[in-house]
């Protein structure tokens, strides 16, 4: 038996089109060295020109400084980086390459149509259309770089994450990590409008956001579409529906925040 790092080390440079790394938690001994600068640099050498590395990163069980460290280490490795969320926003997926990443609905659709296995795997996580995939997009590289500025790198020599992250193992850090990651980013920064080429595509993207109950982003996309086609009947019909859904969400949120439960089960 051998481990993944040594297996990759033994492969010839430039062998792979895509490498996906989803090891267990990054603080585990024997796993932590799959999240270091040296390992990601090794992986980059094994990719073909234009190859892509996909990296799972968790949002829970470590604080935002640990998250900043992991993201900065990855962005130090790859010139082009995109960031996506997973189911229920519990984790992140980093996508890195030395070539520009072609993130468009058409390109995603081509890959889904070309490989039925890929389409099935995506459908298993509620991504049945290219637009569903795009709703997982979080931020582009410029926002990532703002978030990680000044963060310490995770290296084979310091193993920072292995020794730091366990201190937050039993803390609920996911929501705070998401908030700090997106701090300073406008909602527009988290919506990939440039990935759809026309108004019908924008309408499809808006509808995909509603499947995630994200009516704020759906409205933002429809508003941008309306600027291009102000007389579009579909936009005219759906905009007030999405507005009503968003108001209902906000009202429910206010109601939840206004109700507290005491230890004896009473509310006030």
Where are these regions (language model features)?
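The AdoMet/dcAdoMet-binding core of the Class I SAM-like
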Residues: 1-71, 75-77, 195, 211, ...
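Short alpha-helical interface elements
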Residues: 43-44, 48, 68-72, 99, ...
């Amino acid at each position: 038996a051998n481990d993944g790092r040594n297996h990759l080390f033994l492969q010839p440079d430039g062998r792979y089109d895509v490498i996906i790394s989803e090891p267990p938690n990054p603080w585990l001994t024997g796993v932590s060295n799959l999240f270091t600068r040296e390992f990601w640099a090794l992986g980059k050498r094994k990719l073909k020109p234009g190859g892509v590395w996909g990296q799972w990163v968790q949002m829970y069980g470590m604080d935002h400084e640990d998250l900043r460290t992991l993201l900065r280490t990855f962005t130090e490795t790859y010139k082009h980086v995109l960031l996506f969320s997973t189911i229920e926003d519990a984790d992140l997926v980093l996508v890195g390459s030395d070539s520009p990443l072609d993130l468009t609905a058409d390109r995603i659709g081509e890959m889904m149509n070309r490989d039925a296995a890929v389409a099935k795997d995506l459908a298993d996580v509620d991504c049945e259309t290219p637009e569903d995939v795009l709703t997982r997009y979080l931020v582009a590289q410029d926002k990532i770089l703002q978030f990680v500025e000044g963060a310490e790198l995770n290296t084979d020599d310091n193993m920072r994450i292995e020794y730091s992250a366990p201190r937050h193992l039993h803390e609920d850090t996911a929501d705070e990590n998401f908030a700090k990651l997106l701090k300073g980013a406008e909602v527009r920064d988290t919506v990939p409008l440039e990935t759809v080429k026309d108004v019908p595509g924008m309408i499809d993207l808006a509808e995909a956001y509603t499947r995630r109950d994200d009516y704020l982003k759906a409205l933002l996309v429809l508003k941008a579409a309306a600027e291009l086609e102000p007389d579009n009947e579909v936009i005219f019909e759906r905009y007030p529906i999405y507005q009503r859904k968003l108001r209902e969400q906000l009202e429910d949120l206010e109601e939840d925040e206004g109700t507290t439960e005491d230890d004896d089960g009473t509310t006030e």
